[in-house]
Amino acid sequence: MKKINYLLKQAGYFEGRRVDIVDILQMYKECGYHYNADQEAFMEKYAYLEIHYNHPIWKEDMLLRLNPIEAQKEITMDVVEEYNEFLQDDLLIIGDIEKENLTLFLSEKGFYYTGYDDCLKNWGDNFETMIKMLVSGEGGELQILDL
């Protein structure tokens, strides 16, 4: 986890970090997202970080952006609602992975997902473990929606 801590620190994270997320909460309200206290606390802690890492297979610089306002510009609520129905969970957009065109979500039940079209990947319930998996080239559990 040393590497993950280093990447987070490089992105501007520090212990006790709390940022103003009033604009994010307003976007959530306007788009119809629902969120709980844990999801809100996550955003206060990590919002607006840009985590750079080198993709182990493609050997390219990747960018995980924890900016849901920008990420929301790339996905419609119809798609989010389909994901919610499929998972029987409520997803909250928290960012994206730019070069992979993946939208990043935190579910009400505490799981991290990435989505693209009719594919979702479940990365588990630990944010730092998800980053570790991304950096090492591991994949989350693939789930294909039956649309």
Specify the residue positions occupied by each region the protein language model found.
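Compact, glycine/acidic-enriched structural inserts
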Residues: 120-145
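A surface-exposed partner-binding patch
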Residues: 1-102, 143-146
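Short acidic-glycine loop/turn motifs at beta-strand connectors
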Residues: 106-109
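Short, compact, well-ordered microdomains
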Residues: 112-119
